[in-house]
């Protein structure tokens, strides 16, 4: 009876011990992870400092190389000037040039067009013809021409203000006073405040010409023989002198 009870107690102790060890391992794992993060931060900071220092070092090296190159070129220039003899003391004899032929153009006047890939070197002494083309001389402008000034542009005309349109009044023809007037016709005005209408009268009938009465026409107009007292009888004897 005591055997199985002792075995059960041993399993419980083992379980508790294993559980305690597991908690301890988890705690150690977290501590090591924190230490690892700190070490990574330090490593990143060191790498940044290293790159910054390398850049500064390269700048100083470039400055040193430039100064050494300038010293070397200065020393080489001094050695060349000391080793070469003075040419100004012994001038070289001038060669006689043959006069150019009339038909053959001089090589200095010929100018080849520059190519896009290989540009030609500029000549040392430009010809007088090219210099005259480069800078042509013009007579100065007269003072009267320079004194003239362009007329200033006229300012823009101001826009006219739009006036409000007034209501139009009706114009109706009124008949003559001698015509009979019928009843007045009233029309309302177009304005809001116009309440009085204009009195209009009907148009009178058209007047017909009076009938011709044949009895009123004098009989002398229908007679063939005229009276002797007419003022136009003596026109037949009128003579007109036309100068030649």
Swiss-Prot record:
GO terms for cellular component: Ino80 complex. Residues 99-115, 122-136 have a biased composition (Low complexity). InterPro entries: INO80E (IPR026678), INO80E_N (IPR056515). There is a cross-link at residues 159, 171 (Glycyl lysine isopeptide (Lys-Gly) (interchain with G-Cter in SUMO2)). Pfam families: INO80E. It is found in: Nucleus. Residues 157-171 have a biased composition (Basic residues). Residues 59-187, 222-244 are annotated as: Disordered. It comes from the Eukaryota. Residues 230-244 have a biased composition (Acidic residues). One of its GO terms (biological process) is chromatin remodeling. Residues 10-54 form a coiled coil. Keywords: Coiled coil, DNA damage, DNA recombination, DNA repair, Isopeptide bond, Nucleus, Transcription, Transcription regulation, Ubl conjugation. Component of the chromatin remodeling INO80 complex; specifically part of a complex module associated with the N-terminus of INO80. PANTHER family: INO80 COMPLEX SUBUNIT E. Putative regulatory component of the chromatin remodeling INO80 complex which is involved in transcriptional regulation, DNA replication and probably DNA repair. This is INO80 complex subunit E.
